[in-house]
Amino acid sequence: GAIDRILALRPDLVISAGDMVAGQRLPHLGTVEVDAMWRAFHAHVSNPLRAAGIPLAVTPGNHDASAYRGFEAERQIYGEQWRQRRPDLEFVDDAGYPYNYAFSHGKVLFVSLDVTTTGALPEAQKQWLARVLAEHGPRYRHRVIFSHVPLWPFTQGREDDFSGDPELEKLLQDAGVGLYLSGHHQAFYPGSKDHVHFVSLACLGAGPRLLIGDGQRSERSIALIEIDGPDLRFAAL
């Protein structure tokens, strides 16, 4: 399975782009049901990674921490789950963990954005990101952003399901962000625009999607990101 492959690769860290459990349902799920899904996720994913000494950095998705009205309880449970499982990372700004936060590894600055809804990023979070990138970004060779909902669309059926925030895009460009990882569109695609790599991550569960303009469904996969000196390499495995 995917976890066995990850354990065999021995990566420096693992990033999850959200939707680790299947919440955001109507009628709303109860706490018992949501907790049971988290227990299963930890048993199959979190615990094996922790036992192997591989940190897991998470970002909220709409199915595990939706910011849409009515899912406040699921969002709170997400926070409780990951505050109890805080990874062994060098945090640069952890006030918003496990939603929006920043950490470093080697010469790379990683920033999680809390993006579980479509439309522009809230102004307060944009200001926070600008401050983190201005204060800490210049110390690192690479700056990597990750969130659930992408900045731009990748797949069929989700053409309108993205943030599309031009102010955020300009902020990334001005701060020299080299890589933006996202989930939600359930297909692997390594693209780039104006010196920023935008990599959409495939899913491991249900619902692989067709890329826009493509007739072939994306396979389930994990993405291997290799950062070697000035170079960034991406592959779906």
Features from the language model and the residues they span:
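Active-site glycine-centered loops adjacent to acidic/histidine catalytic or metal-binding residues
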Residues: 18-19, 61-62, 148, 183-184
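Conserved acidic residues
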Residues: 12, 143, 178
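Extended active-site neighborhood of metal-dependent phosphoesterases/phosphodiesterases
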Residues: 26-141, 167-173, 179, 191-228
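Short acidic, glycine-rich surface-loop motifs adjacent to enzyme active sites
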Residues: 136-155
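Outer-membrane beta-barrel translocator/channel fold
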Residues: 154-164
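N-terminal active-site segment of His-dependent metallophosphoesterases
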Residues: 1-35, 124
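Histidine-centered catalytic micro-motifs
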Residues: 145-151, 180-188
